[in-house]
A protein has these predicted regions:
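Serine-esterase "nucleophile elbow" of acetyl-processing enzymes
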Residues: 1-35, 45-54
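Flexible, glycine-rich phosphate/dinucleotide-binding loops
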Residues: 2, 38, 103
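Short, surface-exposed alpha-helical recognition segments that flank or form part
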Residues: 7, 34-37, 71, 150
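Alpha-helical cap/lid subdomain in secreted, periplasmic
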Residues: 15-18, 22, 41-171
Length: 171
């Protein structure tokens, strides 16, 4: 999550790093995201994203913009799978965050899109968050006026969700 229309201190990477520090985990959280980017863009940036030799965990939350652009779930899945394989080959743990397509995309698209996250998480035995925006999506108090992107309060909720997964990995 790039922190669309938020001050840097409210970006997910900043909030998550703060949350980690508060509980005694001193990690540097790198924001490798780009606003509006797709899984293909994430794959293209992966070499740069993983260029830091000290990376231990990758939080992979791509695909929502693919859906918004109507990119076929098979194409998104292929990109995500390539990202997963490259990351695991480098012995970096992955927290894989899923998304959910709205019903307005039709049953076939929704089914293919929604199930690809669970399928990949099982296939590669990943730490899995079924829906990254759980508790945030469709809540006007936790989203910007566009109704799509989380606001500062929404980012706090998302950070807590990711933090629970990180604790499982580094306990």
């Amino acid at each position: 999550m790039s922190g669309y229309r938020l001050e840097k201190r409210h970006h997910l990477s900043s909030v998550l790093e703060n949350d980690l520090n508060k509980i005694g985990y001193h990690y540097n959280v790198i924001n490798g995201s780009v606003a509006g980017d797709t899984s293909a863009g994430g794959l293209n940036r992966l070499k740069w994203t993983l260029s830091e030799s000290s990376i231990e965990i990758l939080v992979l939350c791509l695909g929502a913009n693919d859906m918004l652009r109507g990119i076929k779930p098979d194409a998104t899945r292929k990109n995500l799978e390539k990202i997963i394989k490259i990351t695991l080959k480098k012995k970096i743990k992955i927290i894989f965050a899923g998304m959910i397509a709205p019903k307005s995309y039709g049953d076939n698209y929704k089914s293919a899109f929604d199930t690809m996250y669970l399928s990949l998480s099982k296939e590669y035995d990943l730490n899995y968050i079924p829906f990254l925006l759980d508790g945030v999506a469709l809540n006007p108090d936790l989203n910007l006026n566009d109704g799509i992107h989380p606001n500062e309060k929404g980012v706090v909720v998302i950070s807590k969700t990711i933090l629970r997964q990180i604790k499982k990995i580094i306990k």
